[in-house]
Amino acid sequence: MQKAELITAIVTPFNDRDEIDYGVMQRLVDHLIAEGTDGFVVGATTGEGPTLSHPEKITLYTRFADMVHGRALVIANSGSNNTKETAAFTHEVGGIAGIDATLVVVPYYNKPDQNGMIAHYTAVAAAAQKPIVIYNIPGRTGVDMLPATVATLAQNPMIQGIKQCGSLPALSDIIDRTKHDAFNVWTGEDAQALNIKTLGGMGVISVAAHLYAHSIREMYAALDRGDITTVAALQRQLLPKMAALFHFPSPAPTKAALNALGFQVGSPRLPLLPLNASQQQELAHLLGVPELSAIEAEVLA
């Protein structure tokens, strides 16, 4: 699996008929690659994967891989809380040309223990055609994969990374336990985009990169050259903006901002709602601009 340190968890654009808008998706992909994104997660949380049908996912993944055309890493969501279905779908998605890896979430609702998690991922890995990236997000699943469990699964050659959402101590522990070339650790928390690099991880799977990929790239470049003054300044600028994109249920804030920028990604599907006028104004305030369209000056500069 190719290396990627700034991965965008990309939204799924919908048109007025609530169908996937592939024209907008192509524009957004090209823009994000130009801004410094070197990877994508498609059809996952930010991409509203739970609202996509099986045929929609297969078509989306196939067309998305064609859009990227080898210019960036492509990780497609294939996980669920049903082991047999996850194994079958992971196998199917792995057969799509241009898909580099699959994202498999820790089973939600069922709430397995650590041994159950190991059994789940072992079964899915046995069916996989492409590398698997674990997705540990306790706030959405109700269970937390422990660092020791991650280390056990990292020994499986088909399991080559993790998107880890949670505390910094857990993130650091996972990095320390999985120090070998075939396993990549990404944070799924935008606010940890800097921390993950200083801890020796690969990078961030980001929502904020839709708007601030260039600034995150600039921060990473400053870190690489030891310019801590610039790193600190960029981190201070980015943190409140990153938090703002989760002030309302995600990805509604990101979609509202992208719509204001001219990327007509539409509304989220139910049960999520688009931001109303008052919420859009509040989001603009949190992003530090008088109205959402005003972010164009810093995002598209």
UniProtKB/Swiss-Prot annotation:
It is found in: Cytoplasm. Its main location: cytoplasm. It catalyses: L-aspartate 4-semialdehyde + pyruvate = (2S,4S)-4-hydroxy-2,3,4,5-tetrahydrodipicolinate + H2O + H(+). Keywords: Amino-acid biosynthesis, Cytoplasm, Diaminopimelate biosynthesis, Lyase, Lysine biosynthesis, Schiff base. Catalyzes the condensation of (S)-aspartate-beta-semialdehyde [(S)-ASA] and pyruvate to 4-hydroxy-tetrahydrodipicolinate (HTPA). GO terms for biological process: diaminopimelate biosynthetic process; lysine biosynthetic process via diaminopimelate. GO terms for cellular component: cytosol. Belongs to the DapA family. Pyruvate binds at residues 46, 205. It comes from the Bacteria. Pfam families: DHDPS (PF00701). It is an enzyme of class 4 (lyase). SUPFAM superfamilies: Aldolase. NCBIfam families: dapA. Its EC number is 4.3.3.7. The active site is at 135 (proton donor/acceptor), 163 (schiff-base intermediate with substrate). This is 4-hydroxy-tetrahydrodipicolinate synthase. One of its GO terms (molecular function) is 4-hydroxy-tetrahydrodipicolinate synthase activity. Pathway: Amino-acid biosynthesis; L-lysine biosynthesis via DAP pathway; (S)-tetrahydrodipicolinate from L-aspartate: step 3/4. Homotetramer; dimer of dimers. The keyword Ribonucleoprotein does not apply. The record marks 45, 109 as: Part of a proton relay during catalysis.
